[in-house]
Design a protein with these regions (language model features):
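Residues at or immediately preceding the N-termini of alpha-helices
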Residues: 1, 46-48, 86, 141
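Core segments of cupin and vicinal oxygen chelate
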Residues: 1-29, 81-116
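Ligand-binding pocket scaffold of soluble enzyme catalytic domains
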Residues: 9-12, 87-90, 121, 138-145, ...
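Short acidic/glycine-enriched loop/turn segments that link adjacent beta-strands
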Residues: 17-19, 36-37, 105-107, 129-130, ...
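Extended, compositionally biased flexible segments
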Residues: 21-52
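Short, solvent-exposed beta-strand edge segments and adjacent coil->beta transition regions
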Residues: 36-40, 74-78, 129-133
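Short hydrophobic/aromatic beta-strand micro-patches
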Residues: 42-46, 82, 135-139
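Vicinal oxygen chelate
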Residues: 45-81, 102-116, 122-125, 146, ...
């Protein structure tokens, strides 16, 4: 948690049971649960229900996403599912999303929960490890990469421009790969425009 607090400027609060939360002002940016490695993404739903594979949907206020305020520096601002073999139909069916294929390797998941469809998440075909990867808002991708190195993290993918905006992939000294996105205008960077 100290690494990401140093990179994103989070205020860290210790919770009972060895967990920690990272805050940007009055908004929760992340929670580190003792004994759980990597990032876990939570999607809000209309009502609690059981999903396949033991997953669940819970109600609650959306902290981050297309209907939340514009992401501040250090807050989650996008999420992508990195997979070798996409199964877009699963996510669309389980979460009530639409799928918009942008290219052979990339698709957008959209939700019309609160009006017209908005991008909620992306899916990228990759040969790297599979899973949900969070993006965090930063003022400068270049300066963030320098800070990552100063704190003994690694830059896995150097800064580059992708349809979402200017990004880089980074990882802390103890894991937790994520992507940093420079000054997103909304959830999903350029995808927030629609």
């Amino acid at each position: 948690m100290d690494f990401f607090a140093g990179v994103f400027g989070w205020t860290v609060i210790a919770d009972p049971g060895g967990s920690f939360t990272g805050w940007v002002g009055d908004r929760l940016a992340a929670q580190v649960v003792a004994g759980h490695g990597g990032w876990r993404v939570v999607f809000g739903g209309d009502g609690a229900r059981e999903l396949s594979g033991g997953s669940g949907v819970d109600t609650g206020r959306v902290l981050h996403g297309p209907w939340a305020p514009v992401p501040r520096v250090g807050e989650p601002c996008w999420v992508e599912l990195m997979v070798a073999e996409p199964d877009d139909g699963y996510w669309a069916a389980e979460l009530g999303w639409e799928t918009r294929v942008e290219s052979e390797d990339f698709a957008l998941f959209l939700s019309a929960r609160h009006g017209g469809p908005r991008p909620v998440a992306g899916r990228l075909r990759t040969s790297r490890s599979s899973g949900w990867v969070p993006y965090f808002a930063v003022d400068s991708v270049e300066q963030t990469c320098v800070r990552v190195s100063e704190l003994d993290g690694r830059v896995l993918v150097e800064p580059l421009v992708v349809p979402t905006g200017l990004v880089a992939s980074v990882v802390g000294p103890h894991g937790g790969e994520c992507v940093v996105l420079e000054r997103p205008a909304g959830w999903g960077g350029t995808w927030s425009a629609g």
